[in-house]
UniProtKB/Swiss-Prot annotation:
List of residues binding heme b b566: H98, H197
Role description: Component of the ubiquinol-cytochrome c reductase complex (complex III or cytochrome b-c1 complex) that is part of the mitochondrial respiratory chain. The b-c1 complex mediates electron transfer from ubiquinol to cytochrome c. Contributes to the generation of a proton gradient across the mitochondrial membrane that is then used for ATP synthesis.
UniProt GO BP: mitochondrial electron transport, ubiquinol to cytochrome c
Protein name (database record): Cytochrome b
InterPro entries: Cyt_b/b6_C, Cyt_b/b6_C_sf, Cyt_b/b6_N, Cytb/b6-like_sf, Cytochrome_b, Cytochrome_b_C_euk/bac, Cytochrome_b_N_euk/bac, Di-haem_cyt_TM
Cofactor(s) listed in the protein's UniProt record: heme b
């Protein structure tokens, strides 16, 4: 009998082992769809981004008008741009759900997979930030100025570092050029990191909603989960295309329709919605260095999660107190997101400060304590 090329060919064998014959737990729920959705998001963003880059000019005098030209004069340029801009939002929606799933079901106990995932999140955040600067509108310019300026809080080398990043003494043409180069490069880095992420995942196999070893009950990835993933793609593309076609500017800032002007500061400088929770934490501390450290900690805290797991059970499926705490954390993040979009005045300042303290308290203090408490409850 001739050998099956799918199982013998050096390249196809790898594809087969990760997408076709991959043994998968039979009980993984729709929360496990977001990984593949992130892959689709990445491919969509790279494709639309490549098409946009063909019509974009990375120069301060031409960037804004080149984006306008793409939308007005390029065949379906408006659609490509709208899909790319809103695709970024969906990318972040998916990654936040994906991280939430990992937190809830204890997937972080696969430490290598979790850590590469956090690095992926940081790279994605960097990519989205440099990408937001490219249209060279008011919010692009001032966002770049404010966020890069945060590095000046680093003692001793801060100011030098910022001027080195800018390529001058303010955000200008060199900054835009290098941000475009970075925005082109980073998605391919994300693609490479994704392969490492998957390599680590396939070492251990997928986790499942019960958090127990599922080797005795695994099914092939294809056709069961390929079909389930296609359903997921459809359910994601539907709202994405609806948003891109009917209300493409819903999530954007109107300020970005004004070309960048270093002489006029917008009344409210704020990032895109997916960074607002971190921005709120940054603003909550009335000290530059303290704020920057809290901002960094708000994301880097994810690296600590595996070490703070004190429960005997892996998932929260049978841990009601931890579940309650988890949903309080979700609500807290939504409050931070809302506060980040509001002006810096009473009562938003105190709400932001309380929500910031709550965020770190839940993750660093309450989760381990409740985990240990639930271990005690198992004895009764």
């Amino acid at each position: 009998m001739a050998p099956n090329i799918r199982k013998s060919h050096p390249l196809l064998k790898m594809v087969n082992n990760s997408l076709i014959d991959l043994p998968t737990p039979s009980n993984i729920s729709s929360w496990w769809n977001f990984g593949s959705l992130l892959g689709i998001c990445l491919m969509t963003q790279i494709l639309t981004g490549l098409l946009l880059a063909m019509h974009y000019t990375a120069d301060t005098t031409l960037a804004f008008s080149s984006v306008a030209h793409t939308c007005r004069n390029v065949q379906y340029g408006w659609l490509i741009r709208n899909l790319h801009a809103n695709g970024a939002s969906f990318f972040f929606i998916c990654i936040y759900f994906h991280i939430g799933r990992g937190l809830y079901y204890g997937s972080y106990l696969y430490k290598e997979t979790w850590n590469t995932g956090v690095i992926l999140l940081l790279t994605l955040m960097a990519t989205a930030f440099v990408g937001y600067v490219l249209p060279w509108g008011q919010m692009s310019f001032w966002g770049a100025t404010v966020i890069t300026n945060l590095f000046s809080a680093i003692p001793y080398i801060g100011q030098t570092l910022v001027e080195w990043a800018w390529g001058g003494f303010s955000v200008d043409n060199p900054t835009l050029t290098r941000f475009f180069a970075l925005h082109f490069l980073l998605p391919f880095m994300i693609a490479g990191l994704t392969l490492i992420h998957l390599t680590f995942l396939h070492e251990s196999g997928s986790n499942n909603p019960l958090g127990i070893v599922s080797n005795c009950d695994k099914i092939p990835f294809h056709p069961y989960f390929t079909l389930k993933d296609i359903l997921g793609f459809t359910l994601m593309f539907l709202p994405l295309t609806t948003l891109a076609l009917f209300s493409p500017n819903l999530l954007g800032d109107p300020e970005n329709f004004t070309p960048a002007n270093p002489l006029v500061t917008p009344p409210h400088i704020k990032p895109e919605w997916y960074f607002l929770f971190a921005y709120a934490i940054l603003r909550s501390i009335p000290n530059k260095l303290g704020g920057v450290l809290a901002l960094a900690a708000s994301v880097l805290i994810l690296f600590l999660i595996p070490f703070l797991h004190k429960a005997k059970q892996r998932t929260m499926t049978f841990r009601p107190i931890s579940q309650l705490l988890f949903w309080i954390l979700v609500a807290n993040l939504l409050i931070l997101t809302w506060v980040g979009s509001q002006p810096v005045e009473h009562p938003f300042i105190i709400i932001g400060q309380l929500a910031s303290v709550t965020y770190f308290t839940i993750l660093l203090v309450l989760f381990p304590i409740i985990g240990a408490l639930e271990n005690k409850m198992l004895n009764y």
